[in-house]
Amino acid sequence: MLKRIKSVIIGAGLVLDYMYDNAHRIIMGVPRLSRSQITAHLFLGSQYNLIGLEKLKALGVTAIVNMRTTNSYNDAVHEGIKYLHLPTPDNTAPPLETLITGATFIEDEIKKGGVVYVHCRQGLGRGPTIAMAYLIKLGLTYEDAYARIRAVRKFINPQASQVKRLKELEEFYSNSE
């Protein structure tokens, strides 16, 4: 019974979160594009709901990277999907170690033939930051990684602190070669 109540409360929270997100997008003029394909094995988007999780599974997603501070889903929901939660407050840059952890997780999953979905709340700042971290790990410059993602997700908006941290990551990888 308690499990059922918890499930209903989480579900209600997700519905409210989804409604808020859509209202915010309409007011701010941000498109409602839920996900963008960055590479053959990497998708970037906003927080998904339970229906969206089924769509991700249908796309072949084998791993999820969540950049939100909240973790709305328990492990049972992600049955069969690897899950990395890297809690990062909105409009802030994740620590360098977090970018390295996320980029390595994405790279490892893709090398195994997996498909990764990266998200934050709206897919504007934190999600694109970790996706760019992966592309930088592959050898792209920050500018090239940004251009690649912006080509398919025009409304990304990394904060100045996130850009600075990504440039630090680029320097880290170029010094470790």
Stretches found by the model and what they are:
Residues 27-115, 136-168:
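Cysteine-based protein phosphatase catalytic domain of the PTP/DSP
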Residues 113-132:
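A phosphate-binding catalytic loop at a beta-strand-loop-alpha-helix junction
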Residues 7-9, 71, 129, 168:
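Sequence-pattern detector for short linear motifs
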Residues 1-27:
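Non-catalytic regulatory/accessory regions that flank a structured catalytic core
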Residues 5, 164-174:
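Charged phosphate-binding loop/patch that engages nucleotide di/tri-phosphates or the phosphate backbone
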